[in-house]
Each structure stands twice: as structure tokens, then as C-alpha cells.
Amino acid sequence: MMAGLSNAVSSLFLKEFVGAFLLSMRYFFRPKATLNYPFEKGPVSPRFRGEHALRRYPNGEERCIACKLCEAICPAQAITIEAGPRRNDGTRRTVRYDIDMVKCIYCGFCQEACPVDAIVEGPNFEFSTETREELYYDKEKLLANGDRWEREIARNIAMDSPYR
């Protein structure tokens, strides 16, 4: 009898409805937990591995010395390098540096293997394309990425350097 009366009182005063409404109102005035993605972007870790880039020295010369360590260590065999002839000062530079982004698994081994920090995976993660051919990066595209993202790349490398 008491259980039936208790249920009737709860139903009469809409106890569950009021409780749910109060809970909704409490969360309504809290800061939002989600971001409106295309317009708002969350923080990206300095160790984030995004679109590849080739870096230059401050004087404008490319950093890559054509040692081919990144090509050798790439587990997906996505990197192809052709070294040019030795220059008068004994150094080499690349004639061809291609990355097949379709094959790339973004493991970061190329960045870790590079002795001069020439190839890096930058902070850019928004590089969708309409055709598959646009995902074959040549040396010019990689150098352009490096020029575009150099400030962020240098900051990320500096922030991560104590842990290397």
C-alpha cells in the first residue's frame, strides 16, 4: 500500500522530470566540453606528427645532406632520395626527394633518424586532397611546407629537446 502511495506521489509531482531538468540546467551553464571544429581548434602536442616538411638553414640553404638514413629506416618504403654529385666543399644535396604520403604511416622514424633535423613531421594535419596524385610530395612541395611551418616546427623541436 505504501509503495503504491509513494509511486503516486512521485508521479504526481513529476520527481524524475524535475530532477532531470535541474541536472540539464546545471550542465547548461558550465563551459562547453566540445569544440566547434572547423572554426575552433584545440591545442596540438609538440610531438604531434603531421604533414612532412623539409627544413632550411637560416641562410636559405636546405638542410638535407643526402645521407639517405630516412629512406633506409622508413618501414613503409615511402621515401625516395637521389643524391646529387659532391660539391666543391665536399657536401652533397638531394636532386630528388619524394615522399608517397599514401604509403606513409606517420611513425616518425625519418625525423628521428635525420642527423641534421632536415625532414620533420610538422603541425599541419589538415591536408586533404581531391586526387591521389596530390599526396605524392616532391622536394619543392616539402621545402614549401618547411618554409610555411618553420616557426611552429622550430618551437616544437625546442620544446621537445629536453626529452631527446
UniProtKB/Swiss-Prot annotation:
Bilayer topology term: Peripheral membrane protein
The residues listed in the UniProt record as binding [4Fe-4S] cluster 1, with positions renumbered to this chain, are C64, C67, C70, C114
Ranges where the 4Fe-4S ferredoxin-type domain occurs: 54-84, 95-124
**GO CC annotations, alphabetized:** plasma membrane
Q: How is the cofactor bound?
A: Binds 2 [4Fe-4S] clusters per subunit.
The primary location reported for this protein is membrane
The UniProt record gives the binding positions of [4Fe-4S] cluster 2 as C74, C104, C107, C110
Q: Name one GO biological process term.
A: aerobic respiration
| GO molecular function terms attached to this record | 4 iron, 4 sulfur cluster binding; iron ion binding; NADH:ubiquinone reductase (non-electrogenic) activity; quinone binding
Instruction: Answer yes or no on keyword Ubl conjugation.
Output: no
What subunit structure does UniProt give?
NDH-1 is composed of 14 different subunits. Subunits NuoA, H, J, K, L, M, N constitute the membrane sector of the complex.
Q: What is this protein called?
A: NADH-quinone oxidoreductase subunit I 1
- Organism equals Rhizobium meliloti (strain 1021) (Ensifer meliloti)
